[in-house]
């Protein structure tokens, strides 16, 4: 789809709907992974970024305009705000701005390499959802976790994984790699299916 700067009502609706799909995927994966502390703390973000990558690439390619990623990240931040994690709203807005900078050059929304770069960076920075609380907003996060009914064992696991340099390095590398691999799958789906079907 040709990239233009003029937004239509259809573009806005499509962006919001696909952003909602991305957020639902993230929430579902998070809920399923909560059954095991290791999977929840170490693997869940990577799994999320892998599964969301094709949808993200489809959304940005389909709309073909600037600020799609920023809108999605802002909506995501608002969801976290409503859940009580207010500090994640400005954080994800900043992540969205960084991704927009990667995609700013005209025609970038149609280039798999640019989309892959943007989502890979987003995948790395998505870990802020777990890192910011322990680094800067522990009291706010601790109150949120207790109010959500989490057990102390969950909190202890969280602290253990995210204060260990080895585990932290693994989590960051795993999440970034999974986001990248998800984009490889997304690129293939777009090339082999969506373009042939006339979606793009």
Regions found by a protein language model. Name each.
Residues 1-4, 190-200:
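Short, charged juxtamembrane terminal tails flanking transmembrane helices
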Residues 2-71:
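Hydrophobic transmembrane alpha-helices
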Residues 3-7, 62-64, 103-113, 193:
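Membrane-interface helix-boundary motifs at transmembrane edges
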Residues 12-17, 46-47, 69-74, 89-90, ...:
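Hydrophobic alpha-helical transmembrane segments
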Residues 19-27, 75-83, 122-131:
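Aromatic-anchored segments of alpha-helical transmembrane domains
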Residues 24, 92-131, 183:
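Short helix-perturbing small/polar motifs within transmembrane alpha-helices
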Residues 30-35, 75-103:
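Interfacial aromatic-anchored transmembrane helix boundaries in multi-pass membrane proteins
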Residues 41, 117-191:
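Membrane-embedded alpha-helical hairpins and interfacial helices in multi-pass inner-membrane proteins
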């Amino acid at each position: 789809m040709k990239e233009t700067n003029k937004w239509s009502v259809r573009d806005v609706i499509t962006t919001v709907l696909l952003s909602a799909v991305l957020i639902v995927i993230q929430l579902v994966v998070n809920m399923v992974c909560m059954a095991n502390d290791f999977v929840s703390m170490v693997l869940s973000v990577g799994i999320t970024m892998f599964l969301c990558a094709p949808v993200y690439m489809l959304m940005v390619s389909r709309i073909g305009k600037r600020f799609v990623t920023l809108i999605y990240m802002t909506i995501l931040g608002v969801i976290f705000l409503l859940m009580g994690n207010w500090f994640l709203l400005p954080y994800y807005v900043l992540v969205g701005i960084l991704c927009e900078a990667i995609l700013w050059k005209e025609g970038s929304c149609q280039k798999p390499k640019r989309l892959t770069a943007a989502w890979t960076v987003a995948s790395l920075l998505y870990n802020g959802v777990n890192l910011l609380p322990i680094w800067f907003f522990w009291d706010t996060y601790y109150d949120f976790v207790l109010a959500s009914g989490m057990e102390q064992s969950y909190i202890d696991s969280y602290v253990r994984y995210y204060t260990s340099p080895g585990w932290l390095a693994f989590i960051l590398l795993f999440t970034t790699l999974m986001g990248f691999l998800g984009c490889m799958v997304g690129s293939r789906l777009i090339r082999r299916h969506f373009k042939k079907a006339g979606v793009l």
